[in-house]
């Protein structure tokens, strides 16, 4: 974090602006909106600022900047056309430990101005830390289009009702759930349609009913996808933003975790084939206990919870204890990682089916049907199989799969560190030996297309259209690699 985001209350506070031209006028306009007492140090003012001075909306000092000007002000903005003067202002302000901004000179600023979406009292600031102002402006434009003009009205009405809600609903959790329901329900729709009187009646009715409603806990099983935060579903994002507590495993990426509601408790219940693990029974018991405490629990799992994620086992436990639950599917690793590696799971010329199998089974599980897995013209994807790659290759060859069958090991799928090692079934063990976990094994003729179709990360064979990726990032407002590249 290059800059700490903070909103300052400038109402009635003295702010010094050095300069009397168009640049200074733009900053002064914003300061006046915030209620600041603006003082302008300049020998001459342009027409716009002269009019403001004549109306006593700003205090014109009518002289060049002097060091004494900064002593009694809250913050300083240097916006003159004289670069040397601006930098002098900066150094003097720094010596007095006063916040100072030199317009268009990031190296001489103790604070910077973000792009702002104003839905007063709702304000959203967007900043690139001064690195890419145009990108920040484009993001602001996208957000402006997404956010309804009625957002400010919604905030104002909510502010008027805040004390009443606090008096009726005693716990923080109850109040948070109440407001989440209103902002996603009929109240919000009425405000959007400018029916504010009806909206307040709706709010009153909902508040009256709120204490009668069952506020018991629940569990939502959410698939986090293969890693890239941009692949998290909208429903999944909503769930982790509304959770009281999130139980997550080792396959959930940092990018996904950064989207979890900040006040939510996070509990790691991870497991990996090579390392320690949280017993599944302990995780099941924890979900039940937290839900019975009345908390909204999200069980966040890498990939899809019903594809080798033990999601079914966890839901059986919840059903047995009569805990309300829901499921949000996610993009499973076999789909996400192969797509990012440029390996289509099916192809009319090479594979008419795709089979997913796990290399990590229960001790008493029946043996795998190797004859079925060794069939040609199908794509075989093996989860958690890196430790058993030699055995897998041996058994498939014993049951008729050619040692020349293309094979790949994809590590850190869909993440910036993704690596795709390709070879054949004959050297699969060597490919897997050096692959960092989590790794996915892909076997089949479609792997041969990787060389031609790879588009992401270090294995990409050709340049993508940067403009397309930038547009996709801004259009989706995602947090995946496309946005990082932009």
Curated annotation (Swiss-Prot):
Signal peptide feature range: none
Pfam families: CysG_dimeriser (PF10414), NAD_binding_7 (PF13241), Sirohm_synth_M (PF14824), TP_methylase (PF00590)
Catalytic reactions of this protein: uroporphyrinogen III + 2 S-adenosyl-L-methionine = precorrin-2 + 2 S-adenosyl-L-homocysteine + H(+); precorrin-2 + NAD(+) = sirohydrochlorin + NADH + 2 H(+); siroheme + 2 H(+) = sirohydrochlorin + Fe(2+)
Binding site for S-adenosyl-L-methionine: 226, 302-304, 307, 332-333, 384, 413
One GO MF term attached to the UniProt entry: precorrin-2 dehydrogenase activity
UniProt region (Precorrin-2 dehydrogenase /sirohydrochlorin ferrochelatase), positions on chain: 1-203
Active site (record annotation): 249 (proton acceptor), 271 (proton donor)
Gene3D superfamilies: Cobalt-precorrin-4 Transmethylase, Domain 1, Methyltransferase, Cobalt-precorrin-4 Transmethylase, Domain 2, NAD(P)-binding Rossmann-like Domain, Sirohaem synthase, dimerisation domain, Siroheme synthase, domain 2
Region ranges (Uroporphyrinogen-III C-methyltransferase): 217-486
Keywords for this protein: Cobalamin biosynthesis, Lyase, Methyltransferase, Multifunctional enzyme, NAD, Oxidoreductase, Phosphoprotein, Porphyrin biosynthesis, S-adenosyl-L-methionine, Transferase
Residues with the Phosphoserine modification: 128
One BP annotation, GO: siroheme biosynthetic process
Superkingdom as given in the UniProt entry: Bacteria
Enzyme nomenclature, EC number: 2.1.1.107, 1.3.1.76, 4.99.1.4
Residues annotated as binding NAD(+): 22-23, 43-44
InterPro entries: 4pyrrol_Mease, 4pyrrol_Methylase_sf, 4pyrrole_Mease_sub1, 4pyrrole_Mease_sub2, CobA/CysG_C, NAD(P)-bd_dom_sf, Siro_Cobalamin_biosynth, Sirohaem_synt_dimer_dom_sf
Entries under HAMAP family matching the protein: Siroheme_synth
Family: In the N-terminal section; belongs to the precorrin-2 dehydrogenase / sirohydrochlorin ferrochelatase family. In the C-terminal section; belongs to the precorrin methyltransferase family.
Biological function: Then it catalyzes the NAD-dependent ring dehydrogenation of precorrin-2 to yield sirohydrochlorin. Finally, it catalyzes the ferrochelation of sirohydrochlorin to yield siroheme.
Protein name listed in UniProt: Siroheme synthase
Organism field: Neisseria meningitidis serogroup A / serotype 4A (strain DSM 15465 / Z2491)
């Amino acid at each position: 974090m290059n800059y700490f985001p903070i909103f300052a209350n400038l109402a009635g506070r003295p702010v010094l602006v050095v300069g009397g031209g168009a640049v200074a006028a733009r900053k002064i306009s914003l300061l006046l909106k915030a209620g600041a007492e603006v003082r302008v140090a300049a020998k001459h003012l342009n027409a716009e600022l002269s009019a403001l001075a004549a109306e006593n909306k700003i205090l014109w000092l009518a002289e060049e900047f002097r060091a004494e000007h900064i002593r009694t002000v809250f913050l300083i903005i240097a916006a003159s056309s004289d670069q040397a003067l601006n930098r002098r202002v900066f150094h003097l302000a720094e010596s007095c430990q006063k916040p100072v901004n030199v317009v268009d000179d990031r190296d001489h600023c103790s604070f910077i101005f973000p792009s702002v979406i104003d839905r007063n009292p709702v304000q959203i600031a967007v900043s690139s830390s001064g690195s890419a102002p145009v990108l920040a402006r484009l993001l602001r434009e996208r957000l402006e289009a997404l956010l309804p003009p009625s957002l400010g009205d919604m905030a104002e009405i909510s502010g008027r009702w805040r004390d009443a809600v606090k008096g009726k609903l005693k716990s923080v959790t109850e109040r948070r759930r109440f407001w989440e329901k209103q902002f996603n329900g009929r109240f919000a729709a009425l405000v959007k349609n400018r029916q504010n009187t009806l909206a307040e009646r709706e709010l009153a009715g909902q508040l009256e009913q709120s204490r009668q409603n069952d506020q018991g806990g629940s569990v939502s099983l959410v698939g986090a996808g293969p890693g890239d935060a941009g692949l998290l579903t909208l429903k999944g994002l909503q769930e982790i933003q509304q959770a009281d507590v999130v139980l997550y495993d080792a396959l959930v990426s940092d990018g996904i975790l950064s989207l979890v509601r900040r006040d939510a408790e996070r509990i790691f219940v991870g497991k990996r084939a090579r390392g320690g693990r949280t017993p599944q029974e302990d995780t099941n018991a924890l979900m039940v206990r937290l839900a019975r405490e009345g908390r909204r629990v999200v069980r966040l799992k890498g990939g899809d919870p019903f594809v080798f994620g033990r999601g079914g086992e966890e839901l059986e436990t919840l059903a047995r204890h009569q805990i309300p639950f829901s499921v949000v599917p996610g993009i499973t690793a076999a789909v996400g990682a192969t797509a990012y590696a440029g390996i289509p799971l099916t192809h009319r010329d090479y594979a008419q089916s795709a089979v997913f199998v796990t290399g990590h089974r229960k001790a008493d599980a029946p043996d795998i049907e190797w004859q079925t897995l060794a069939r040609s013209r199908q794509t075989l994807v093996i989860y958690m199989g890196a430790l058993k790659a030699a055995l897998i290759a041996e058994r498939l060859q014993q049951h008729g799969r050619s040692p020349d069958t293309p094979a790949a090991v994809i590590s850190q799928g869909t993440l910036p560190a993704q690596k795709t090692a390709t070879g054949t079934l004959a050297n699969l063990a060597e490919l897997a030996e050096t692959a960092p976990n989590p790794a996915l094994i892909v076997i089949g003729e479609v792997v041969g297309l990787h060389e031609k179709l790879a588009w992401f990360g270090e294995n990409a064979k050709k340049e993508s259209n940067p403009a397309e990726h930038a547009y996709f990032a801004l259009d989706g407002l995602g947090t995946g690699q496309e946005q990082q590249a932009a």
